[in-house]
């Protein structure tokens, strides 16, 4: 089978230009173990003619050694890249795949199904616009289905495709499809998910993946590919509120001072009056500079360099917003936290918190409750362990611009970094901005404060609390 475009062999520049203006859709696949995630992705790539002859030949050669589908070509081998994945027949790491059709470009995040890889799935879901949740038609809605749906909802994914797979093993039964559809509807109602698309399919045989199935004439809806090509996902992004975290101050010579970064949300035009946070100083946009020339307007996700009419002291970590924007800064937040480290988290330990380009020390002041991702029940805990998801209260040393993740992904997401190892130990989503603490302060002598600072600097593994915050 050949690639869908002959241009890639004859004129690579023309091929790239052809795809440059297409809209990009990022989606992830998730489901229980052996629901067919990797097979589905392999089928998407195969039927949309995005596989080269040598790739397909390699899969045929590996089929006898690692294949799990008998005489049929195991398309999952196209995407199960790690040797351990192939040998166990499961997905372990998040694998990103790229393909395109005549209408759209796609990035797929193939995420693990096992509960011990919850952190991997959360990572894959963080940049996606849509989730494909696979359900085995023989087993229906399972505990893992609820877990994946909860994580997708937590990460702000508004569009869910419920792919009821392996319909060939239940004789393409409409009754089975309707039963699972009703059962999942109850789960979605609990999570407040409304944009649902149900598709009966067989990824192994290709039914309703790219092409409509002749085995299920009772299904009159769209195939999976038709949904992927037509779904409108602009509503999931904040196109209104301009937020521009400064990543780098570019000063190549005395006559140029530009502020580099990526537009986190909204848009900005030349001449717009902007405000710099945290300083609060205002100016107007003079130029929007890119490698390909200046722009009149910059949109969400565009990487640009902005210059201002006035000389203002701006550094990495500052945020540019429209002057009229009502933006609240604080150093206390309520947030969902996904713990990704094998080292447990205890409230009060000091970490680095990274909001966009802003990094500040801080700690988890309190754990409100842990969320059971399988049952959605809440429980009290004293510390967070690997793959735990909890609602916590953050106390930061410095004020930052942060908003609810459900309102603005660009300013509502953050990561937590261990100060000693520099390893990312958690990812979080802001739920609410809290008022600054007005708790009663403790009294410590200057010597005690100085000694505490010395201990925290030279013996960070002791996890000493910063008593200066209690003054």
Swiss-Prot record:
Region called G5, residue ranges: 202-204
Top-level EC class: transferase
Residues at which GTP binds: 31-38, 110-114, 165-168
One GO term (biological process): hydrogen sulfide biosynthetic process
Catalyzed reaction equations: sulfate + ATP + H(+) = adenosine 5'-phosphosulfate + diphosphate
SUPFAM superfamilies: EF-Tu/eEF-1alpha/eIF2-gamma C-terminal domain, P-loop containing nucleoside triphosphate hydrolases, Translation proteins
GO MF, any single term: GTP binding
Residue segments, region G4: 165-168
Enzyme Commission number: 2.7.7.4
Domain of life: Bacteria
InterPro entries: CysN_GTP-bd (IPR041757), CysN_II (IPR044138), CysN_NoDQ_III (IPR044139), G_TR_CS (IPR031157), GTP-eEF1A_C (IPR054696), P-loop_NTPase (IPR027417), Small_GTP-bd (IPR005225), SO4_adenylTrfase_lsu (IPR011779)
Keywords: ATP-binding, GTP-binding, Nucleotide-binding, Nucleotidyltransferase, Transferase
Positions of region (G1): 31-38
Pathway listed: Sulfur metabolism; hydrogen sulfide biosynthesis; sulfite from sulfate: step 1/3
Region of interest (G3), residue spans: 110-113
Annotated stretches, region: G2: 89-93
tr-type G domain boundaries: 22-237
CDD domains, sorted: CysN_ATPS, CysN_NodQ_II, CysN_NoDQ_III
Sequence similarity: Belongs to the TRAFAC class translation factor GTPase superfamily. Classic translation factor GTPase family. CysN/NodQ subfamily.
Function in brief: With CysD forms the ATP sulfurylase (ATPS) that catalyzes the adenylation of sulfate producing adenosine 5'-phosphosulfate (APS) and diphosphate, the first enzymatic step in sulfur assimilation pathway. APS synthesis involves the formation of a high-energy phosphoric-sulfuric acid anhydride bond driven by GTP hydrolysis by CysN coupled to ATP hydrolysis by CysD.
UniProt subunit comment: Heterodimer composed of CysD, the smaller subunit, and CysN.
HAMAP family, A to Z: Sulf_adenylyltr_sub1
Protein name: Sulfate adenylyltransferase subunit 1
Organism of this sequence: Saccharophagus degradans (strain 2-40 / ATCC 43961 / DSM 17024)
Origin organism lineage: Bacteria, Pseudomonadati, Pseudomonadota, Gammaproteobacteria, Cellvibrionales
Gene: cysN
């Amino acid at each position: 089978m050949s690639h869908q475009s002959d241009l890639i062999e004859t004129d690579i520049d023309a091929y790239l230009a052809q795809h440059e203006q297409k809209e990009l859709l990022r989606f992830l696949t998730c489901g229980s173990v052996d629901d067919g995630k990797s097979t589905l992705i392999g089928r998407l790539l195969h039927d949309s003619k995005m596989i080269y002859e040598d790739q397909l030949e390699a899969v045929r050669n590996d089929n006898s050694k690692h294949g799990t589908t008998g005489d049929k070509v195991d398309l999952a081998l196209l995407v199960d890249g790690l040797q351990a994945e192939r040998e166990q027949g499961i997905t372990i790491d998040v694998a990103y795949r790229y393909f395109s059709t005549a209408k759209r470009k796609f990035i797929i995040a193939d995420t693990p199904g096992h509960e011990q890889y919850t952190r991997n799935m959360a990572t894959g879901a963080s940049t996606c616009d849509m989730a494909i949740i696979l359900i085995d038609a023989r087993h229906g809605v399972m505990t893992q289905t609820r877990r994946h749906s909860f994580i997708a909802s937590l990460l702000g994914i508004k569009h869910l495709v419920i792919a009821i797979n392996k319909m060939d093993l239940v004789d393409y039964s409409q009754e089975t499809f309707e039963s699972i559809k009703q059962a999942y509807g109850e789960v979605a109602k609990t999570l407040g998910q409304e944009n649902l698309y149900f598709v009966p399919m067989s990824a192994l045989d290709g039914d309703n993946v790219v092409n409509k199935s002749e085995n299920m004439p009772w299904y009159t809806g769209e195939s999976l590919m038709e949904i992927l090509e037509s779904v409108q996902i602009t509503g999931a992004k904040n196109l209104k509120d301009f937020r521009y975290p400064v990543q780098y101050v570019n000063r190549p010579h005395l006559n140029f001072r530009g502020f580099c970064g990526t537009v986190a949300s909204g848009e900005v035009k030349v001449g717009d009056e902007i405000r710099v946070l945290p300083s609060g100083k205002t100016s107007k946009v003079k130029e929007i500079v890119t490698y390909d020339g200046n722009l009149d307007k910059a949109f969400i996700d565009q990487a640009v360099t902005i210059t201002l009419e006035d000389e203002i002291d701006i550094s990495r970590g500052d945020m540019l917003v429209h002057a009229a924007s009502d933006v609240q800064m604080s150093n206390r937040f309520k947030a969902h936290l996904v713990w990704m480290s094998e080292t447990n988290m205890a409230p009060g330990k000091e970490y680095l918190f990274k909001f966009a380009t802003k990094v500040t020390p801080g700690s988890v002041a309190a754990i409100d409750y842990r969320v059971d991702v399988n049952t959605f029940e809440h429980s009290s805990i004293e510390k967070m362990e690997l793959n735990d998801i909890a609602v916590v209260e953050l106390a930061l040393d410095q004020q930052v611009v942060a908003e609810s993740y459900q309102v603005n992904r660009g300013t509502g997401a953050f990561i937590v970094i261990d100060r000693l190892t520099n390893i990312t130990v958690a990812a979080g989503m802001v739920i609410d901005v809290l008022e600054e603490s007005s708790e009663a302060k403790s009294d410590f002598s200057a010597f005690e404060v100085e000694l505490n600072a010395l201990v925290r600097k030279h013996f960070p593994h002791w996890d000493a609390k910063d008593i200066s915050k209690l003054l």
